[in-house]
Amino acid sequence: RFTDAGHLLGSSEVELWLTEGDVERKIVFSGDVGNVDQPILNDPQPVAETDYLVVESTYGNRLHGERPDYVGALTEILQQTFDRGGTVVIPSFAVGRTQEMLYFIREIKEQGRVHGHDGFPVYVDSPLANEATSIFLQCPTENLDPEARELVRSGVNPLWFEGLRTSVPSHQCECRAEGHPFCQRNVRCGAYPASFKA
């Protein structure tokens, strides 16, 4: 049986029951398991019990506390940086984190939380991130958490906002007259990264 691992769109835990003679054993296998109360995706479905558990465990030696206020922290960073005339660059994994950042930035812009800089542009420099985002937008709404599901059902795209610019092939990159780069290709962090410029 597959259960929702809540890590990435479509991620699953696999529950297997094996019988040998009169003895039945349950084995659960999973890669990463997501956190609860994250935006966009459903929380991971708990596994009631198992005889053997095989799971990715990068953070398996600690308990996660309450989820930080990412929207508040990001708002503060954007506000302070824009007030100084700066640019915010956010290195992000192309799948999962990029969509989460888009979700947060849409919320920040929708609520007008960055004062005096309402129309700031956001550039996502990653064709892979753009493809992943389009897959998120095509998935059945039952794969989304209740808040994102309600946004989609009410006609709101939770991963798009005014001022969002996505990367284009490098031969189409050009600088605009006012000097703002249309496309940034100079930040690379880890495998399959995306970079944001706001």
Locate the predicted segments by residue.
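Hard-cation-handling environments
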Residues: 77-198
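His/Asp/Glu-rich metal-coordinating catalytic cores
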Residues: 1-100, 106-117
